[in-house]
Amino acid sequence: MKPRHRRLTLIALVLGGLGLSAGLALTAFQDNLVFFFTPSEVMAREAPIDRPIRIGGLVKAGSVEREAASARVHFKVTDTAESITVSYDGILPDLFREGQGVVAQGRLGADGRFHATQVLARHDETYMPAEAKEALDRIGQGNGTPGPDGHPETTTAY
């Protein structure tokens, strides 16, 4: 084999390996990517069905229902404009309460319910995930305090 042919073969193998590695990395990244949606966006059918997503908002007052024979809980998450029913089979966080902020991760079913695999409650009265805060500010339900630029101030997520 001539040196030039050997060099071209080596370059082709290296480029092929890099391409394969990039393809595998992008596939893994896409499989682990989870987008955030508000109840209004879910009800407007902007969220994918049967793909992992996160929804966030407030637990609607009077909506929490617990099944007696299991750990399954049903509740509604609202952004004050729309609500979506969430089903969760597990133990809820200690800070989970009606009227408090919550982020649920799971899948939107064809039945219109959100089937959560994880429920996160905010950990003090000033904390709200940045995505949820921005979404509430967009629909005019944020804290309403204008900042120096005239837009509502947002609470920083730590």
Curated annotation (Swiss-Prot):
Heme binds at H123, Y127. The keyword tRNA-binding does not apply. SUPFAM superfamilies: Heme chaperone CcmE. Residues 1-7 are cytoplasmic. Residues 138-158 are annotated as: Disordered. GO terms for biological process: cytochrome complex assembly. Residues 29-158 are periplasmic. InterPro entries: CcmE (IPR004329), CcmE-like_sf (IPR036127), NA-bd_OB-fold (IPR012340). It is a single-pass type II membrane protein. GO terms for molecular function: heme binding; metal ion binding. It is found in: Cell inner membrane. The chain crosses the membrane at residues 8-28. Disulfide bonds: none annotated. Pfam families: CcmE. Keywords: Cell inner membrane, Cell membrane, Cytochrome c-type biogenesis, Heme, Iron, Membrane, Metal-binding, Signal-anchor, Transmembrane, Transmembrane helix. GO terms for cellular component: plasma membrane. Belongs to the CcmE/CycJ family. Heme chaperone required for the biogenesis of c-type cytochromes. Transiently binds heme delivered by CcmC and transfers the heme to apo-cytochromes in a process facilitated by CcmF and CcmH. NCBIfam families: PRK13254.1-1, PRK13254.1-3, PRK13254.1-5. This is Cytochrome c-type biogenesis protein CcmE. It comes from Alkalilimnicola ehrlichii (strain ATCC BAA-1101 / DSM 17681 / MLHE-1).
